[in-house]
């Protein structure tokens, strides 16, 4: 087995998947990375297969998807696997980010890993939006029209940029072609960023752990211990995903998208996929178009400032009760935003959306630094009392 350590390619695999020393107290919350990698592989394989039968033209896109569903051998399975794994991908990413926020994975020396992860999240959202347009149902067309129109909020040149993106004066053949090309290419860019994410993690301090202390005191090799641990959650994931694919494949979709796109008829409500709803709610809660767009993008990118705003001395919230409370309030608020994004723009949803948006941004900009300062002060007071 000496070749595993001497061969230039095998030694890389060995360093990352076999001999990689991991803290011995990792919980199952550290399994999301392998699950997300598994999702990306599924998406690339099923996506390339679907692309072999898809026709990116306004007149044939919807029919080609129907052809995949009805005529291609197991085409229904490939398509449902692709669409449901996309939802699973985002669900797991949100859990992965939530775990990172709770356990302080953004703190030095893992700041670069956190930053690359945020870029991956933004690129995932862009890729998902492009893919949602491709079946060219009603929600595809009108979703594409609404979201690309956000670029018109850019002063002076906005409308020109929108028409440049469309390749015409509305969503047309050129739009569908370029969206298909980008949707095909971006997952491979995503895979490259995932490798960078891994390299940044391994070349700094490796994985964190639930205690937030140095993991150097007790480590175990990745194989066989953590490979087996990852396989448990991968098999559980396959079971849950199979239940969705075989028993309720359309539960996370929108019924409007099973109607061929009609530019002359607007759907009753234009709603994106569930995983983009919190940011859609933030966009709609601000009356000004430009400020709404800025707020929506800021809501995604704001997690990058966590290494600066978290002034706590310990990594993670395990031993910080006040921060724990604020974290769970933040999670509840995020779920409220998700629900509000699916509702019509009317009272009281507008007011609730504005309150939730203020709470969302104040969590990162005001609550986190303030609560961490209070906790630091309480610790100092306790230490002074014990010394005296």
From Swiss-Prot:
Heme 1 (or BL or b562) is low-potential and absorbs at about 562 nm, and heme 2 (or BH or b566) is high-potential and absorbs at about 566 nm. This is Cytochrome b. PANTHER family: CYTOCHROME B. Keywords: Electron transport, Heme, Iron, Membrane, Metal-binding, Mitochondrion, Mitochondrion inner membrane, Respiratory chain, Transmembrane, Transmembrane helix, Transport, Ubiquinone. The chain crosses the membrane at residues 32-52, 76-98, 113-133, 179-199, 226-246, 290-310, 322-342, 349-369. GO terms for molecular function: metal ion binding; ubiquinol-cytochrome-c reductase activity. It is found in: Mitochondrion inner membrane. Heme b b566 binds at residues 96, 197. Its cofactor is heme b. Heme b b562 binds at residues 82, 183. CDD domains: cytochrome_b_C, Cytochrome_b_N. A ubiquinone binds at residue 202. It is a multi-pass membrane protein. InterPro entries: Cyt_b/b6_C, Cyt_b/b6_C_sf, Cyt_b/b6_N, Cytb/b6-like_sf, Cytochrome_b, Cytochrome_b_C_euk/bac, Cytochrome_b_N_euk/bac, Di-haem_cyt_TM. GO terms for cellular component: mitochondrial inner membrane; respiratory chain complex III. Binds 2 heme b groups non-covalently. Fungal cytochrome b-c1 complex contains 10 subunits; 3 respiratory subunits, 2 core proteins and 5 low-molecular weight proteins. Cytochrome b-c1 complex is a homodimer. It comes from the Eukaryota. GO terms for biological process: mitochondrial electron transport, ubiquinol to cytochrome c. Pfam families: Cytochrom_B_C, Cytochrome_B. Belongs to the cytochrome b family. Component of the ubiquinol-cytochrome c reductase complex (complex III or cytochrome b-c1 complex) that is part of the mitochondrial respiratory chain. The b-c1 complex mediates electron transfer from ubiquinol to cytochrome c. Contributes to the generation of a proton gradient across the mitochondrial membrane that is then used for ATP synthesis.
């Amino acid at each position: 087995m000496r070749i595993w350590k001497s061969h230039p390619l095998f030694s890389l695999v060995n360093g990352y998947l076999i001999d990689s020393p991991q803290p011995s107290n990792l919980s199952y919350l550290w399994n999301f990375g392998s699950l997300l990698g598994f999702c990306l592989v599924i998406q690339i394989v099923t996506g390339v297969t679907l692309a072999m039968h898809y026709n990116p033209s306004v007149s044939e896109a919807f029919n080609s998807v129907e052809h995949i569903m009805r005529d291609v051998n197991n085409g229904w399975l490939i398509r449902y696997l692709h669409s449901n794994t996309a939802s699973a991908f985002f669900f797991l990413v949100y859990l992965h980010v939530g775990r990172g926020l709770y356990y302080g994975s953004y703190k030095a020396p893992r700041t670069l890993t956190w930053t690359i992860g945020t870029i991956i999240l933004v690129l995932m959202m862009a890729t998902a939006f492009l893919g949602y347009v491709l079946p060219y149902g009603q929600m595809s067309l009108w979703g594409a029209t609404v979201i690309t129109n956000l670029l018109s909020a850019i002063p002076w040149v906005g409308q020109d940029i929108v028409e440049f993106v469309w390749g015409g004066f509305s969503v047309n053949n050129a739009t569908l072609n370029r969206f298909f090309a980008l949707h095909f290419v971006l997952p491979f860019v995503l895979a490259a960023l995932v490798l960078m994410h891994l390299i940044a993690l391994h070349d700094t301090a490796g994985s964190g752990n639930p205690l937030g202390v140095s993991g150097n005191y007790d480590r175990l090799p990745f194989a066989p211990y953590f490979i087996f641990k990852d396989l448990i959650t991968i098999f559980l994931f396959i079971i849950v995903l199979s239940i969705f694919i075989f028993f309720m494949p359309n539960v996370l979709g929108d019924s409007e998208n099973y109607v061929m796109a009609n530019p002359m008829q607007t759907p009753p409500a234009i709603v994106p996929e569930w995983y983009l709803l919190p940011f859609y709610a933030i966009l709609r809660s601000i009356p000004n178009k430009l400020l709404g767009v800025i707020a929506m993008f800021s809501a995604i990118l704001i997690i990058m400032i966590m290494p600066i705003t978290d002034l706590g001395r310990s990594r993670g919230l395990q031993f910080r009760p006040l921060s724990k409370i604020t974290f769970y309030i933040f999670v509840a608020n995020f779920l409220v935003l998700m629900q509000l994004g699916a509702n019509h723009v009317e009272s009281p949803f507008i007011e609730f959306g504005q309150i939730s948006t203020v709470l969302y941004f104040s969590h990162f900009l005001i609550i986190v630094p303030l609560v961490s300062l209070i906790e630091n002060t309480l610790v100092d007071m306790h230490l002074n009392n014990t010394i005296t």
